[in-house]
């Protein structure tokens, strides 16, 4: 992850509003995969000379992507989780290693009945509940709605209906994608109570692909900037080092994926708002070709430059997310 500055992000002294949680969710302890240890994140043999320690994550090795990739031996950054868990003193925040490390791994577990969509969703909600106070990656958590979605998707799998590789996969949406019945603030106090009456086209397409939406993520106000700061909702923090910025403007999506609070998410990019969080959080993102993904229901920053796109833990994950997002809107006719 390459950082542009060694300076700590500026934090606002203004009081931060409490995170908005839609519905009451019981986050009782339900150890995911307890009965299926073989489905837990696989171990990877890494040569001792290239193995990364927690100290490496805060040192020069973190600044060189090739070093990171060599240390992971192609395994993906999720495999660092066992080293990071419980390292609060080092300023690091990440989820438990018992959660799937990729969309493909989660999809295999769901189809093998190692766990249900509801169990997977509940596990991620537990992780959010634990790490949100430190990361500030979310503006709104849609816990009850997510569990309801997951139960419906479980019923479909039992009935033999499989929507594809994203069926039951927990993801997040940047808070400038309209979501019916769930507030969309665009990161601004001005829109803090705005509730759209329809989903953005991308939100609809991803729901049709079977994703479970865990909530709406932090962003720079009106997608203006790459700092991850927000005067009203407070600053987001980088899970690799809580004293640093996760980048922006898709700051919450980047931080949530890197911390293992979801398996992927949506962002938008006008001048770097997908690419910067992907780089600063050491995850993967893509800025699709202009017009490849619908912008209907996505709050505009600059009509001629805005692009909607996905972020994920790996190229494979991002490819699956992008496949669900792509598609043109019907042409507009001027009468």
Please place each PLM-identified region on the residue numbering.
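Twin-arginine (Tat) signal peptide motif
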Residues: 59-69, 82
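Residue-level signal for the nucleotide or nucleotide-sugar donor/cofactor binding architecture
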Residues: 63, 101, 112, 251, ...
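N-terminal secretory signal peptides
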Residues: 1-63
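Short acidic, glycine/serine/threonine-rich loops at helix termini
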Residues: 184, 224-228, 275-280, 298
């Amino acid at each position: 992850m390459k950082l542009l500055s060694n300076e700590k992000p500026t934090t606002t002294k203004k009081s931060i509003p409490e995170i908005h949680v839609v519905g009451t969710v019981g986050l009782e302890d339900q150890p995911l995969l307890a009965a299926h240890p073989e489905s837990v994140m696989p171990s990877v043999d890494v040569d001792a000379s290239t193995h990364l320690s927690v100290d490496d994550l805060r040192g020069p090795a973190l600044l060189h992507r090739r070093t990171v990739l060599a240390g992971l031996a192609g395994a993906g950054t999720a495999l660092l989780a066992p080293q990071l868990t419980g390292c609060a003193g080092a300023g690091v925040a990440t989820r438990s290693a018992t959660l799937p490390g990729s969309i493909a791994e989660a999809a295999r577990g769901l189809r093998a009945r190692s766990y249900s969509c509801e169990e997977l969703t509940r596990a991620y909600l537990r992780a959010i509940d634990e790490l949100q106070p430190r990361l500030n990656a979310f503006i709104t958590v849609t816990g009850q709605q997510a569990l309801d979605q997951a139960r419906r998707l479980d019923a479909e799998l039992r009935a033999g209906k499989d929507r594809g590789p994203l069926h039951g996969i927990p993801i997040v949406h940047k808070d400038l994608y309209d979501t019916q019945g769930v507030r969309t603030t665009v990161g601004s106090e001005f829109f803090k109570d705005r509730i759209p009456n329809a989903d953005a086209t991308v939100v609809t397409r991803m729901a049709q692909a079977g994703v479970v939406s865990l909530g709406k993520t932090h962003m720079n106000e009106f997608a203006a900037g790459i700092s991850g700061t927000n005067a009203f909702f407070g600053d987001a923090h980088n899970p690799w080092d809580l004293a640093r910025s996760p980048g922006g403007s898709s700051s919450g999506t980047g931080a949530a994926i890197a911390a293992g609070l979801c398996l992927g998410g949506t962002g938008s990019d006008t001048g770097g708002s997908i690419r910067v969080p992907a780089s600063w959080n050491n995850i993967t993102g893509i800025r699709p070709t202009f017009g490849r993904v619908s912008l209907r229901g996505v709050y505009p920053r600059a009509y001629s430059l805005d692009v909607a796109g996905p972020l994920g833990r790996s190229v494979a994950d991002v490819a699956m997310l992008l496949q669900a997002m792509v598609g043109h809107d019907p042409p507009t006719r001027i009468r």
